[in-house]
Amino acid sequence: MESVLKQSRRIVVKVGSSLVTNQGQGLDHSALAHWAGQIVKLKKTGKEVVLVSSGAIAEGMQRLKWKKRPHAVHELQAAAAVGQMGLVQAYETCFRKHELHSAQILLTHEDLSDRKRYLNARSTLATLLDLNVIPIINENDTVATDEIRFGDNDTLAALVTNLIEADVLVILTDQRGLFTADPRKDTQAKLVEQAKAGDADIERMAGGAGSEIGRGGMLTKVLAAKRAARSGAHTVIASGREADVLIRLARGEAIGTQLLAETMTLAARKQWLADHLQIRGNVTLDEGAVEALAVGGKSLLPVGVTDVRGNFERGEVVGCLDPHGREIARGLVNYNAAETRRILRRASDEIESLLGYIGEPELIHRDNLVLL
């Protein structure tokens, strides 16, 4: 088995907190220099590299002399603001020694949810790569409240992979890869060397929380691979403790777990719909509507909706659930939540009499709908 990095041209590399800090107590500058050196060698082989690096909050904790990761959002934001300065300065110093420029890019869900800002971010990243600059990306934790509570850089790295249409996402962690069970608890656990991204069995294998310093467990990495696969990108989950891991992967050596993108690649706009917009509510469908969407490729009509949850406005994203509560699709809704409740289970020709107007005959048009 050969590593998917060997034939790849554009790569997103995500480095976890444990690989860039001194056990969470500030940045490990020798480790950052090591990652920079490997990235430089990849670039010399003709590969383009975007780096998603954790470590800002851990560095902020060190500078503020905090021994434990705080739980209060405003304290996390303060740590991120202080630590981001040190993180970017350290990387800049490392890359300058190789006569390369680096660029800081801080993103939030809001940046990627707005179509215009999404396209601007993509253009900026493409320009930086053309200029031989190494983009260093992190979440803008200082302003993104819900990202600090629920987000992680694994997810961000996957969304960046979609954004720039990278060939491979490499997630480096302190574990060797994905195992059939938790190797810390089960001595019979075996490394999964290769599997299909999005495989339900693989998602069941993954579990457990991350460290006190970082936020991402193995499940977030497996779900990140599923997201990356929507733009046709493969994912490698490997140990950053392996010597020269990036260089060896680029040479074709199989290290860690490869999760292959074997699903149909979504068009760029539908990738944006699937992963870059936050869901504001859910609608539950009957079996007929599920079949119409999943098999027939139809639009979602109000008659096929049995329940509405959430408080959403026209044009926002809602998840489409089957009768068992499993999300099968999501899309941009043509009516707000209150209106949707009034027209559910009703034929489209009744909408005007129920609401006093008709915007669209569909609740979600198929052009604004993506199957998951």
Curated annotation (Swiss-Prot):
GO terms for cellular component: cytosol. It catalyses: L-glutamate + ATP = L-glutamyl 5-phosphate + ADP. ATP binds at K14, T173, D174. Its EC number is 2.7.2.11. Substrate binds at S54, D141, N153. Its main location: cytoplasm. It holds the Pfam family PUA. It is an enzyme of class 2 (transferase). It comes from the Bacteria. Residues 280-358 form the PUA domain. HAMAP family: ProB. Belongs to the glutamate 5-kinase family. PANTHER family: GLUTAMATE 5-KINASE (PTHR43654), ISOPENTENYL PHOSPHATE KINASE (PTHR43654:SF1). Catalyzes the transfer of a phosphate group to glutamate to form L-glutamate 5-phosphate. This is Glutamate 5-kinase. It comes from Nitrosospira multiformis (strain ATCC 25196 / NCIMB 11849 / C 71). The lineage of its organism: Bacteria, Pseudomonadati, Pseudomonadota, Betaproteobacteria, Nitrosomonadales.
